[in-house]
Amino acid sequence: MKRNLNESSARSTAGCLPVPLFNQKKRNRQPLTSNPLQNDPGVSTVSDSYGSPSFPTDWAWEAVNPEVAPLKKTVNTGQIPASASYPWRSQDSVSKSIQSNAERSQSAWGYRGNNRNTSLRTWDFRPQHKTVSPAANSEFSSCPVNLGAQQQKQFQTPEFPNLPGHKEAEVPRQTCLSKLPGSTMKGPDRASALQAFKPSFQQNPFKKTVLGDIPRENSLKEGTLHQLKEKDNSLRIISAVIESMKYWRAHVQKTVLLFEILAVLDSAVTSGPHYSKTFLMRDGKNILPCVFYEIDRELPRLIRGRVHRCVGHYDPDKNIFKCVSVRPASASEQKTFQAFVTIADAEMKYHTKVTNEM
């Protein structure tokens, strides 16, 4: 891992001593965890393209371990020292340049020493590394924080001078974690985060009020429907036999009534003028002539001697029942027809009584 400077000095070509370069493939790379200082000209800004700005790792290693710094010194990728561009003169000059770089890095760390602790323990930037790294940005992409210049300004400018360096980075991290379901926070930080996002939790009462209005609207609709049912004057089909149909039509002359009768076909179907079909219906001893006009549909096949259901209105002047629908009656209709006739008679009595009083 280490080259001997004596062996490298023995190989001199063209009157210049070769510059000992460190093999970068075998070096132990340090993670880029710290933020660079843009105003300091001595700090390299090569790591800005990675989205997590930091100091070069060789300066950090020299600041922590200054005794092994001369053996691990490499060419700086951000800015090349002035001593590296000239021929090799002596090891003393190299050690002086390394020490000057180490002092410059320490002075760069002392730039923020007015507001924060400048001890070597400040290298524990794990919370800050999580918030600045690209993986963390993808994890907390739902946090409404601008990741551009505002994030760099937030991590570079000390908003809380009395707190350590890593506390400043934990504040936006905790606000982002408060939105996640699996986040765990303790103490006043959790309470402050919950207070910061309190308006988002106040939507549940709004939903409850909205949901609470639905039964009220349903009750209003039911009330309006109930009122409509009371004032409903729509057309109704009156179930009646032939005798009761003639009776109600004679007593209620000014109202158009639509009757429903169940009777037995007592004649063959004959064709008449204007696409009409005539036939006779019998109910006990009462016989009623009927007519059906095939205007929009044809008359279905009727069988003589069977019970049929006829719907239409009665013309007392011509003594004819003008049908609008004729079909064979089902067994259930024949069973319930007598009950329907009783209900219709009661309704018609009430209707005639009200109209006579008016």
Swiss-Prot record:
Region Disordered, residue ranges: 1-51, 81-122, 150-172
Compositionally skewed regions (Polar residues) per UniProt: 1-12, 30-51, 81-121, 150-159
This protein's UniProt keywords: Chromosome, Meiosis
Source organism, top-level taxon: Eukaryota
GO biological process terms on file: fertilization; gamete generation; homologous chromosome pairing at meiosis; meiotic DNA repair synthesis; regulation of meiotic cell cycle; reproductive system development; spermatocyte division
Tissue: Specifically expressed in gonadal germ cells, when male and female germ cells progress through prophase of meiosis I.
Subcellular location: Chromosome
InterPro entries for this protein: Spata22
Transmembrane segments: none
Annotated Gene Ontology cellular component terms: chromosome
KO phenotype (gene knockout): Mice develop and grow normally but show infertility in both sexes. Gametogenesis is affected with germ cells that do not progress beyond early meiotic prophase, with subsequent germ cell loss in both males and females.
Quaternary structure note: Component of a multiprotein complex with MEIOB and RPA2. Interacts with MEIOB. Interacts with the complex BRME1:HSF2BP:BRCA2.
PANTHER family cross-referenced by the UniProt entry: SPERMATOGENESIS-ASSOCIATED PROTEIN 22 (PTHR35258:SF1)
Biological function: Meiosis-specific protein required for homologous recombination in meiosis I.
Protein name from the UniProt record: Spermatogenesis-associated protein 22
The encoding gene: Spata22
